[in-house]
Amino acid sequence: MALPTPTWARPIGLAFFFLWSLVAGAAANLHVSPVRVELAAGRASVALTVKNDGDTPTVVQTQVVAWSQQNGEDVYTPTNEVLATPPIFTVAPGATQIARVALRREPDAGRELAYRIFLQEVPGPPRPGFQGVQMALRIGIPIFVEAKKPQELKLDWSAHREPGGELRLFLNNVGGKHVQVYDLNISSVENAAPVYSNQSASYVLPGQRRSWLLKPLERQTLSGDRIRVKALTDTGRVETEIVLGKP
């Protein structure tokens, strides 16, 4: 059974933080590095460093899930293909704890595999007299397993105008590895000034498609049917020209 997709808070770097309302106390200040795990046939395990910058001990529970996408939405399912140890641990104030992530299967021959490890703060008892609401931190770290055969990044862009002046932009990842897009700027081929822009970070896994509905920037209009797409990704800058299609 697929796990429900959590409600995301604002991304910080490549790690995503979730705030869950729990009873009493203040959220611990946890920091995890690295913010992305990359495994391969010759690199089957990686150590995560968890640091507690708070003033109280913090109990952390780990969970690894398989990560896929459907209709542009993240889907998480239970898995035993990646193991996180220890599954639960306590980090003293100002101290660090090593959590190890280990691959328990062979990498896929022709496609990158994706998982996430969630590190969930387990709330302790409330301090005497506290009557507030505790915000428990949940950190999601992407895990990617490189395919046995090197994969190229292959992106297929398309777009069309919407009746209200918006632009519907599609990205089809036809390659065998993920891409993270965190900056989009769309302009006419004849004019470099951006007409549409989106700064949010989005992953598109291999074989998946994502779309953005973009509103025009103030006092900007798109001329002609040829547009230039510029994007920043986790593998570098992407720039391409496409012809607008029909809805």
Question: What residue ranges belong to the model's regions?
Answer:
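Terminal connector regions
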Residues: 105-150, 219-247
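Bacterial N-terminal signal peptides
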Residues: 11-23
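N-terminal secretory signal peptides that target proteins for export/translocation
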Residues: 1-8
